A protein has these predicted regions:
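Cell-envelope/extracellular polymer assembly enzymes that use nucleotide-activated donors
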Residues: 2-5, 23, 33, 191
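A conserved acidic beta->alpha catalytic loop
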Residues: 30, 38-47, 65, 89
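Glycine-rich, basic loop-to-helix element that forms the pyrophosphate-binding segment
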Residues: 64-80
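Donor-binding/catalytic cores of nucleotide-activated saccharide
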Residues: 69, 90-204, 211-227
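Membrane-interface aromatic/basic loop that binds lipid-linked glycans or pyrophosphate carriers
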Residues: 111, 241, 269-347
């Protein structure tokens, strides 16, 4: 058994992969295994993987048919042997002390999760650290999950990406956590991170930027996002169902409806390339019992009062959210969508 399993999904990254792998193999901490998952790549990435594996015994290879990013990460999790799990995207690269610093933080504080910063890198060069937070250890049992979501997740002070954290594999395996299929939900990182949070007692936050998040014009995040509204609504439903299944729903009742509305559902409606798809998704989801419950909770007083207190948004935002939920529940999907779409010129 090693201390860390580093999982790298690989697909169409021939030009970026050597820099990524070099940065991992150059870590000042060497008690790790590197799991490279070939997700059916069609370029020369598989040959690059094989060449590196011949040079370093810490590298383990998986070759599989293309199944998407979630499928590749799950394949890596299935064979991981480390006490901790770290994900690195194959077009990014990392600082030499990432593993040393995060393992030390986890071991010295007893944190279930170590969260760290990153910087964007594009044609203009490397930018400043993207997120703004302090080094700290957060005891979620003292703070409360609802306050953590409002204080750190809602304003995006702490990232939700898979590759900005060190996880305990024991928690992942104990609760059977895996990434949902990309075809079914958007922002699979968000769902996994939220589910993991429900089993987290302590977080160690490191403000240093350890990951160089490389911006590519042909990356998954840069492409158009078909069925975005439906996939984010599905994410919302699954998060609510999971919180209920593990007995944490009551603890986050004041934040969960607002989180799903403000950060997921509204985002899906605003940025889905097809309003027809938005309306169809809303009609289909209107019959979902979990979505109905979420919308009724959104109309309640407490979630929206907490929303205003923590975000500084005024009474108009509360009224809009309640009206959105009321219209959707009563079948007026066009009227509900119009409240949050914000673009008059959409066809």
């Amino acid at each position: 058994m090693c201390m860390v399993s580093v999982i790298v999904p690989v697909y169409q990254v021939e030009a970026y992969l050597p820099r990524c792998l070099d940065s991992i193999l150059a870590q000042t901490y060497d008690d790790f295994e590197l799991i490279l998952v070939n997700d059916g790549t069609k370029d020369n990435s598989a040959a690059v993987m094989e060449a590196y594996a011949q040079r370093d015994p810490r590298i383990r290879l998986i070759h599989k048919e293309n199944g998407g990013l979630s499928s590749a990460r799950n394949a890596g999790l299935d064979i991981a042997r480390g006490r901790y799990i770290a994900f690195v995207d194959s077009d990014d690269y990392i600082e030499p002390t990432l593993l040393a610093d995060t393992v030390h933080a986890a071991e010295s504080t007893g944190a279930d999760q170590v969260l760290f910063n990153y910087c964007l890198e594009d044609e203009a060069g490397v930018h400043e650290p993207y997120l703004h937070f302090d080094d700290e250890v957060i005891d979620l049992d003292d703070m409360g999950l609802d306050r953590y979501f409002y204080r750190y997740w809602m304003p995006y002070k702490h990232g939700q990406e898979a590759w900005s954290k060190l996880y305990r594999r024991g928690i992942i395996e104990q609760y059977g956590l895996r990434y949902a299929p990309n075809a079914e939900i958007f922002a699979e990182d968000t769902l996994f991170s939220a589910m993991y949070l429900l089993h987290t007692h302590r977080i160690a936050a490191l403000s240093k930027a350890y990951v160089h998040y490389v911006q590519r014009g042909d990356s998954l995040m840069a492409m158009k996002k078909p069925r975005l509204a439906r996939r984010l609504m599905t994410l919302s439903v699954r998060l609510c169902e999971y919180a209920k299944a593990v007995g944490r729903e009551k603890e986050i009742r004041s934040v969960l409806p607002v989180l799903c509305y403000d950060k997921l559902i509204c985002k899906g409606i605003r940025f889905d390339p097809s309003l027809d798809d938005v309306y169809a998704a809303m009609r289909d989801m209107a019959g979902n019992a979990t979505m109905q419950q979420l919308l009724r909770q959104l109309m309640g007083v407490m979630p929206l009062v907490q929303y205003t207190l923590h975000t500084g948004k005024g009474i108009r935002t509360q009224v809009r959210a309640r009206l959105f939920a009321w219209r959707w529940l009563h079948g007026d999907v066009r009227g509900a969508a119009a409240l949050v779409d914000g673009r008059e010129d959409r066809a």
